[in-house]
Amino acid sequence: MPRPHQRTRSLRRVYVRTPGGETKIHYEKRRPGPARCAICGRPLNGVPRLRPVELRKLPKTAKRPERMYGGVLCAECLEKLLKKSIRSQVLAQLEQLRRSVAAGQS
């Protein structure tokens, strides 16, 4: 009979074959769900599904992609976000240029 704290389905059962030939049950905590995009909610590629204790053992580059908002946004949402921000900056610069040209003519 397992110990009382092991009698829960929140722990996963791992069947381990011992050198003596018998099978024992080890109880481990389950893996977390995948990291998800903050905008669209899709699972993120390049972010491992590990518990925080196991994530601590990985180097920084193995924890998330090395791009802007890596580990927070998916590549598609990041592309849309960058296009939107750059286009708004360009439009603001054009508007400022039009105002300066109009002020110079009058």
From Swiss-Prot:
Keywords: Ribonucleoprotein, Ribosomal protein. One of its GO terms (molecular function) is structural constituent of ribosome. It comes from the Archaea. The keyword Zinc does not apply. The keyword DNA-binding does not apply. GO terms for cellular component: ribonucleoprotein complex; ribosome. GO terms for biological process: translation. Belongs to the eukaryotic ribosomal protein eL34 family. PANTHER family: 60S RIBOSOMAL PROTEIN L34. This is Large ribosomal subunit protein eL34. It comes from Hyperthermus butylicus (strain DSM 5456 / JCM 9403 / PLM1-5).
